[in-house]
A protein has these predicted regions:
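Short alpha-helical
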Residues: 80-81, 106-107, 126, 229-230, ...
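Glycine-centered loop/turn motif at secondary-structure junctions
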Residues: 61, 94, 116, 135-137, ...
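Asp-based, Mg2+/Mn2+-dependent phosphohydrolase catalytic module
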Residues: 1-8, 125-156, 160-187, 199-200, ...
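Short amphipathic alpha-helical segments and helix-helix/interface helices
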Residues: 54, 87, 108-112, 128, ...
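Alpha-helical substrate-recognition element adjacent to the catalytic core
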Residues: 1-106, 150, 159-251
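Short beta-strand/turn micro-motifs composed of small residues
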Residues: 12, 76, 121-122, 225, ...
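Active-site phosphate-binding/coordination module
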Residues: 90-113, 118-125, 139, 243, ...
Length: 302
């Protein structure tokens, strides 16, 4: 099977803790921010919420350094001048990130396509929203732990509707309630759901997993959904139709997700609803909000 490289784009504030310099930018403006970054460019930045994920992603390449499975690229609203501190920190931590786009205050989302990225992680919700609208997987890292889980395996958990799948079924739930949703999913059980914004990212992870024996895979995935039976059948048949393996599937029928994400040992969890992200961060799980689909449209109107 031909190897397909997974490309993940990440912003500087998602990779490193830039709270101090960002506070200066907010309170004193761009010029003060630039001076601060240059004056402190030899000071190594502390890890941000996406740091441990990046380190685990890049560690997958250790088994095949001449033909890496994963590339991480930096996309930042810093200038190249102020970005020197970021690259100094990348070098310090030996992250192996060699490609970057510095946009001097402009949204970098247009470079996601140029880099061929399967995923964009940022702390800037506007950049994430624009990336999703352009048809690429993107999420806003909210909070969590900057340190890795105890497992050397990278463990990624996904919500289903509006993340892996379209929000088609979620719209019925939001507009007509649970009984109508359950009846629709029972009726449509054998019809695969359309793909959501994270389908291609999951497929890229699956492609890497297929390069390894199952017991040696450096990646483990989980679907953690509020769906319960009988709405589970359509999900199972959808993944089967896509020919994508997901290692664990948790159908929680409305239970809070946090404890289950902790039990899975998730390094990151992607969900379109902030309350589920909050449930994850309550368990010190890094959560990334996907501002996509009917639930977020509803939030914008209120």
């Amino acid at each position: 099977m031909q190897k397909q490289k997974l490309v993940v784009a990440i912003s500087s504030r998602a990779l490193f803790n830039l709270d101090a310099s960002h506070a200066i930018f907010e309170s004193q403006g761009k010029d003060a921010f630039c001076r601060y970054q240059i004056e402190h460019e030899d000071e190594i930045l502390e890890p941000g919420y996406g740091f441990s994920l990046v380190r685990k992603l890049l560690s997958i390449n250790a088994s095949c350094p001449d033909a890496p499975f994963v590339e991480v690229v930096l996309v930042s609203q810093n200038s190249a001048d102020t970005g020197l501190r970021i690259f100094n920190s990348i070098d310090h931590y030996q992250l192996g990130i060699t490609r970057a786009a510095f946009t001097s205050g402009m949204s970098p989302y247009s470079y996601i396509s140029a880099f061929g990225a399967h995923l964009f992680l940022s702390t800037n919700v506007d950049d994430v929203t624009k990336t999703l609208a352009a048809g690429f997987a993107a999420a806003t890292i909210l909070s969590g732990s900057p340190t890795a889980s105890s497992s050397t395996q990278l463990r990624i958990a996904f919500d289903g509707d509006a993340v892996l799948f379209s929000d088609e079924a979620e719209r019925i739930y939001q507009q007509h309630g649970l009984p109508a949703f359950a009846e629709n999913e029972r009726h449509e059980a054998k019809n695969p759901l359309p793909g959501g914004p994270f389908k291609d990212f999951l497929r890229a992870l699956h492609h890497i997993q297929n390069q390894f024996e199952p017991h040696d895979s450096p990646i483990r995935t989980a679907l953690v959904t509020a769906r319960g039976a009988p709405a589970h059948e359509r999900v199972v048949r959808t993944l089967r139709a896509w020919n994508i393996r997901i290692d664990e599937a948790l159908f929680l029928d409305g239970l809070p997700k946090g404890a289950f994400l902790k039990a899975f040992g998730a390094d990151i969890f992607f969900d379109d609803q902030k309350r589920h992200c909050d449930s994850a961060t309550d368990q010190q799980i890094t959560a990334a909000h996907v501002p996509h689909g009917v639930t977020n449209q509803k939030t914008e109107k209120t």
